[in-house]
């Protein structure tokens, strides 16, 4: 029988724009994540020597997020030196997969107490910084029918029959729900303010939610992946899905978040 697994607590940083103009641009990834470990230790008066492992997902594990960033974060938070750390990359599912693996470790009886999550600072380590065969090897890309994720999303929308207006309406409702949750305190216990080395608060709550977004406003934006699609990726998609009409580009890329 698997050992029962419980998530005891969940915390994150507030989110801001994932560009150099974002509020958290000056904060290093290891400081973002270490602040959360420090808060967990204080909140539960945790003897960190009991932690069996820290598992962290990271999509671009290079530069300031490179090496084994999970272990770097453990050290930066000044947890017990016996606590190990492991970094994993499953693209956008990296943080979730870290939690899955932590649960598997406990369920198997191998370990008892595991901290899991993810760290990513897109304002300091831009998406695609780590390269890879998909990005830099055209022969591999054609062989595997690779297209960028955004074009993949637009292909799914085309196959499923979702219109541009459908996804714009969903985007608007998502912004409104996020603002409602923030403004009504639903995130208060889980969002941990980011502070500088002097203890001064840099960001206390999510500052890039846009509740005033409208379907009409979004309709005026150009699809983000229409141009890359016309440069050859559409041909790759249509070769794989030969019954598909031309890809309908519905996907909009707004500036993304930075946080943990």
Please place each PLM-identified region on the residue numbering.
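Short, well-ordered secondary-structure micro-motifs
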Residues: 18-19, 66-67, 125-127, 205-206
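Flexible glycine-/small-residue-enriched beta->alpha junction loops
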Residues: 2, 107-160
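Conserved active-site "lid/cap" helical segment
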Residues: 1-77, 84-87, 92, 155-164, ...
């Amino acid at each position: 029988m698997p050992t029962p697994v419980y998530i005891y607590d969940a915390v994150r940083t507030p989110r801001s724009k994932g560009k150099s103009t974002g509020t958290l641009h000056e904060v290093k990834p290891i400081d973002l994540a270490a602040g959360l470990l420090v808060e967990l230790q204080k909140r539960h008066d945790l003897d960190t020597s009991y932690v069996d492992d820290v598992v962290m997902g990271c999509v671009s594990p290079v530069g300031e997020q490179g090496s084994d960033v999970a272990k770097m974060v453990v050290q930066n938070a000044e947890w017990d030196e016996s606590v190990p750390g492991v970094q994993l990359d499953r693209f956008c599912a990296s943080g979730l997969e870290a939690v899955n693996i932590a649960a598997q470790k406990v369920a198997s009886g191998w370990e008892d107490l595991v901290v899991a999550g993810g760290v990513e600072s897109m304002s300091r380590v831009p998406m695609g910084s780590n390269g890879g065969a998909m990005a830099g090897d055209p022969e591999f890309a054609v062989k595997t029918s690779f297209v960028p994720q955004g074009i993949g999303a637009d292909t799914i929308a085309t196959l499923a029959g979702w219109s541009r207006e459908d996804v714009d309406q969903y985007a608007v409702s998502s912004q409104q729900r996020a603002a409602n949750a923030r403004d009504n305190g639903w995130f208060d216990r889980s969002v941990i303010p980011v502070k500088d080395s002097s203890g001064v608060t840099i960001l206390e709550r999510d500052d890039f939610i846009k509740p005033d977004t409208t379907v009409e406003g979004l309709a005026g934006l150009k699809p983000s992946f229409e141009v890359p699609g016309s440069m050859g990726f559409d041909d790759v998609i249509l070769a794989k899905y030969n019954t598909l009409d031309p890809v309908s580009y519905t996907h909009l890329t707004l500036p993304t978040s930075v946080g943990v």
